[in-house]
Amino acid sequence: MSYSLPSLPYAYDALEPHFDKQTMEIHHTKHHQTYVNNANTVLESFPELAKFSVEDLIKDLDKVPAEKRTFMRNNAGGHANHSLFWKGLKLGTTLTGDLKAAIERDFGSVDSFKEKFEAAAATRFGSGWAWLVLKDDGKLAVVSTANQDSPLMGEAVSGASGFPIVGLDVWEHAYYLKFQNRRPDYIKAFWNVVNWDEAAARFAQAK
């Protein structure tokens, strides 16, 4: 079984004016597709890896032969991260219920959570991601990872751990056509397109 580019559950212009059509289309069909294609070259050479989901593979990169481990960390990581990212975007959803209560419990308020998340996204040097994760102790935390690392890879690999609830891509390819060097503006725009329904479902799944 090879990896495939997931279809988006919305049109490329569905998140306008916050995320623009051109960026969404290029990001999905060019950048994400490249991660899929690259990861599939390893699955072709090592077909025993094809039985694992991309999430299970990046949770235990020791499954991958040493000479391809960094390559798959980057490319399988990119496939997993982007697959989560697309599902996590939607106009018009609201943070409610158990997830909102847990955010208020662990951060003090929703605004305090947003401040921490924005800081993690803005201060990630170079390329990477900001995440809201559920830790093993049952508490929510904000973390960031470099490049295409995921919290699923664990502290030893990515410097972060936890089950991803919300993720934001802060690679320049995610925002540069619309926002140029104004990463903080892109981060602020993200709050208009977070799919809180998907986040709540992931939180319920992870609990």
Curated annotation (Swiss-Prot):
InterPro entries: Mn/Fe_SOD, Mn/Fe_SOD_BS, Mn/Fe_SOD_C, Mn/Fe_SOD_N, Mn/Fe_SOD_N_sf, SOD_C_sf. It catalyses: 2 superoxide + 2 H(+) = H2O2 + O2. Disulfide bonds: none annotated. Transmembrane segments: none annotated. One of its GO terms (molecular function) is superoxide dismutase activity. It is an enzyme of class 1 (oxidoreductase). Binds 1 Mn(2+) ion per subunit. It comes from the Bacteria. Its cofactor is Mn(2+). Keywords: Manganese, Metal-binding, Oxidoreductase. Mn(2+) binds at residues 27, 82, 169, 173. PROSITE patterns: SOD_MN. Pfam families: Sod_Fe_C (PF02777), Sod_Fe_N (PF00081). Its EC number is 1.15.1.1. Destroys superoxide anion radicals which are normally produced within the cells and which are toxic to biological systems. Belongs to the iron/manganese superoxide dismutase family. This is Superoxide dismutase [Mn]. The gene is sodA.
